[in-house]
Amino acid sequence: MIKVFVMPTCPDCTKVMAQVKDNPEYQIIDIGAHVRNLKEFLYLRDNDPVFDAAKRYGFAGIPCFVLEDGTVTLSSLEAGISPARNGASCRIDGSGC
């Protein structure tokens, strides 16, 4: 099962959530729903180099995908999901929302 870390207020996340809804191959984890989920995501974000560019440019790093082999990626394509069309994107400073 592929874990998908999201927040419903993130435009990119809502597109991914709509694509994987009711698909048993994906587990949606809302990082805003419980502190346990947030801690799990922050551990990944703090320790996996896949987030380096996202952090450098002020992005949160969601949606984030943890593949069945443990690989962490920010690419929906690598997780078997069609890439979202360009649209709104939120940065940590609130711009782009």
Regions found by a protein language model. Name each.
Residues 54-61:
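Thiol/disulfide oxidoreductase modules built on the thioredoxin-like
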Residues 14-16, 38, 74-77:
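Short glycine-/acidic-enriched loop or helix-start segments at secondary-structure transitions
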Residues 25-48:
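Thiol-based oxidoreductase modules, predominantly thioredoxin-like and allied folds used
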Residues 70-90, 94-96:
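C-terminal cap of thioredoxin/glutaredoxin-like
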Residues 1-31:
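Local sequence-structure signature of Cys/Sec-based thiol-disulfide redox active-site neighborhoods
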Residues 12-15, 66, 92:
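Residue-level detector of bioactive/disordered segments in secreted/extracellular proteins
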Residues 61-73:
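A short, hydrophobic beta-strand/beta-hairpin element that forms part of a small beta-sheet core
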Residues 18-20, 43, 79-80:
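Short, glycine/charged-enriched secondary-structure capping and boundary segments
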